[in-house]
């Protein structure tokens, strides 16, 4: 999990496409706010339309991480689009390309 690894000072940045940590925290009974507070490096969340409120603008992630978190929302996408989206759909292909380009730019900025 990107956020767990991001608590290690050896990591310089983290990118989460359609972040699923809110659901995972719920399933393993871990406090999401505590998980976020442990993060030691900048983060980029690329959120789909049906991802939870905590990974969107104004959500818990932004409240806890502040300027250390960038969020880009993809209102036309559903959770999982970047790894299992139908690339024959031009809208999905467009947003997958955009997401991966944003991720590369973000990582290059901090590496």
Where are these regions (language model features)?
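Conserved loop-alpha-helix segment in the C-terminal half of the alpha/beta-hydrolase fold
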Residues: 58-68
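A short helix->loop->beta-strand "cap" motif at the edges of active sites that frequently abuts
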Residues: 11, 40-43, 66-68
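Conserved alpha/beta-hydrolase "acid-adjacent" motif
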Residues: 52-58
